Amino acid sequence: MTNVITRFAPSPTGFLHIGSARTALFNYLFARHNNGKFLLRIEDTDKERSTKAAVDAIFSGLKWLGLDWDAEVIFQSKRNDLYKKAALRLLKEGKAYYCFTSQEEIEKQRQKALENKQHFIFNSEWRDKEPDAYPTDVKPVIRLKTPREGRITIHDTLQGEVVIENSHIDDMVLLRADGTATYMLAVVADDHDMGITHIIRGDDHLTNAARQIAIYQALGYEVPSMTHIPLIHGADGAKLSKRHGALGVDAYKNMGYLPESLCNYLLRLGWSHGNDEIISMTQAIEWFNLDSLGKSPSRLDFAKMNSLNAYYLRMLDNDTLTAKTVEILKQNYKISDKEVSYIKQAMSSLLVRSETLLDLAQLAQIYLVDSPIVYNQDAKEIIENCNKDLIKQVTEGLNKIEKFDKESVQNKFKEIAAANDLKLSDIMKPVRALITGMDASPSVFAIAEILGKENILKRLETI
C-alpha cells in the first residue's frame, strides 16, 4: 500500500459529536496501522457558525481520547487563495463558467419543478454564453460545467460501487460571488493538496461524493479511496439526536467515562475483531482494517458503555482512582489530606458500586468529614420517620467501643438489635441514612472503621 494519509475534517460549529469522534478514531487507527499520517483539518469556511470555542472543543476532545494528529492543523479559512486558483484554472480550461443567475431566479425554477412534480436540477442560461454577454453590474459565481452525458461511479470500500448519472448532478457553485470557495471545492482542493489517500467518513457524505468526484475529474486529480461508514443510531434505531442522551465527547468526559473505555466502545460500534470486546489502543492499531467494518448502523447502548467503563475503572490502580475521584470532588469541595486518605482506604468498596468516575465521586462524599453531609430525598424520609430512641441507643453503644473496627461495630449493632427484638436491617437503615446521607451505600461497618468513632458519633448526633 502507498503511504497512507487520512484526515479528520470537522466543522467547528458545536461540540465534538460522538459520531465524529468515532470517524476520527477510525481514520487515526487506519493511519497508524499502515504507518501513515493522520491529519486534522478544520472546515471553518462558514464564518457565521464557526467559533473558537468549537475549535477548542475539537482539539481538547481529540487530545483527551489520545488521537494525536501529525503536522500542523489546516484551517480552510486561511486557504482561499488555493481554492480560487483551482476555480480560475477550471474557468480557463472551459470546465467552469461565470453564472449571473440570482437566487430569486433559481428559486422560481425550483418552485416550477415542484409544481410540475419534477426533480429539480438547476440549468443556467450562462453555461455556454460568451463573455461579451456578461452584465457589468452583477457579481457572478463560478460554477462547474458538469458533463451532461455519462455517469460517475463511486468505488466505495464498504458500500461497493455506487453509480450516479451526470444528468442528476447540477452545475455546483465553486466560488461564491464574494470570492470565497464553497465546501465542495475546498474539500477537493484540500484533500489533493494534503495528499490524502483514504477518506473515511459517515455515509451521510455519500451524496457529496459524486459531486466531489466530478470536481476531482475536472481538475485532473486522483480520487482518494473512499469508505462511507453507517451512522450511529439511538437505542430505538432512530438517527442519533439529543433525546438519546449526551452527544459531545466533553459531556462523556464530564459524566465520568474514561478515554480508553470510550475509544474501545466507539471502536466496537461498527467494527469487530472476532468476538473480542475488550480491545486496547495498541491492539486496535495492530488489528484495524477496513474489511471488518459493518454495513449496518450501530446503536448507542449506555448499559454496554457503562459496563465497559466499569471494567476499565477496575484496571486502574488505587492511587490513580483516588486522584481522579478527588479531582472531581474538588470542583465543589475543599478536600483535606485526611479526607483523601479516607477515600483511598475506601476505594475498593466504592469501586464495587461504581461504573463511572462520577459514581465514585458521588459515593466518596461519604468521607468528606469537613463538609456538611448531603442527604438524598430517600435518606431524609428515612431519618424523619426513624425511631429516635433507637438511634440514641446506637450512639451510646458505639461510644462504649474501645477498639473501633468493623467487627466491633457490627457486633454492637447485633447486640442492640437483639435487645430490641429487631432485625439488624431495621437498625442499619436509619443509621446508614444518618452516616452516609444515602439510602444505599457500601458497608456501614467498613465506613465506620475508616471514619473513626468521633466522626460517626458526630453524624449520629445530628438527628
Curated annotation (Swiss-Prot):
Catalytic activity: tRNA(Glu) + L-glutamate + ATP = L-glutamyl-tRNA(Glu) + AMP + diphosphate
CDD domains attached to this UniProt entry: GluRS_core
EC numbers, comma separated: 6.1.1.17
Gene Ontology CC annotation, any one: cytosol
Motif placement: 'KMSKS' region: 239-243
Function according to Swiss-Prot or TrEMBL: Catalyzes the attachment of glutamate to tRNA(Glu) in a two-step reaction: glutamate is first activated by ATP to form Glu-AMP and then transferred to the acceptor end of tRNA(Glu).
Name used for this protein in its record: Glutamate--tRNA ligase 2
